[in-house]
Amino acid sequence: ARRFQSGFAAGISGDPEDTEKHPWDMFELSKHPDNLLRFVDDDIPGLTTPWVYCGMLFATFCWHVEDHYLASVNYAHKGSAKTWYGIPGSDAEKFEAIAKTAVPSLFKENPDKLHHITMLVPPGQLIENKIKIVKLVQKPGDFVVTFPRAYHSGFSHGFNVGEAVNFAPVDWIEMGRVACRNYVKGNGKRNAVFAHDRVVVTAAKSLKKIFETTKSRGKWMAHMSRVLRTDLETLADELENWQSILNGKQRGDGFIKGDPLRFYKCQNIPEMDGPEDCCVVCKAMPFAAVVRCECEFGRSFARCLQHWNRGCDCKQRHRMVEMRMEVDELRALAKSLEL
């Protein structure tokens, strides 16, 4: 769509010369005040900007969830219908367990097979295993919305043209945090495509600025404030815990032996996140704190706190933690959003 524009690009009148945006233009969705993806300072096709695509008879999209467990909206512009199957996010883990038992040999060879978007499990088999599943037929002019972590699959009845993009309402944040934790465990289908923590921090700073300049406290602000504060406190707690572990003050999971890691304050936080900001081990994208090493490889590539001792063979004393935000900063930002 970035190259050919949205299917709604002709504007309200349908005249190509009409510059007034159609109210359903999916490029406009990324700018909506309630869409947290507007804080992602990158053009990510299909995620922050829509994809326009064509289907054909029996063209299939296998079971999958969206990146970062985001919500999505899909519009059928023209052509034949499309059948969809959906599973609510509440049954996502149950579905994953059933999928692994359906073809155990495939998962033995490739544990993250489900995330390659190449697997179909018959709806009847899912129903037999008490998994909630819904079906719909999308016709031209119909919108289909998928909710965070809702697995979905389907197929086209013939040639058709559709358009889709992701979006992130404020209620997505909690599920986005779950996605981050699963990425760190190696349960993501590919690299994280943006830094969840950067989005939350940027959104919180934006809301704080609105509070300071307008003194407004609308209902939507109260809800957003509450959700952002909760996630910021969660991030601060996790960061504080890992600081305690990596400086040798706390025993437990990840406890280090020998010299504690060095911590230093990052003076120039990158304005955007790129592939080099992904953890070289799990492909998650840390933001508040990044582990580096003095070696050439370690200076160029990041590690998340959970994988501080992976990625190169250097001695522990050469590892250091680049602090982009301190625990106190995160807690102060959260407190500034109190109503």
Region spans (language model):
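Conserved N-terminal structural segment that caps and organizes enzyme catalytic cores in eukaryotes
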Residues: 1-143, 147-339
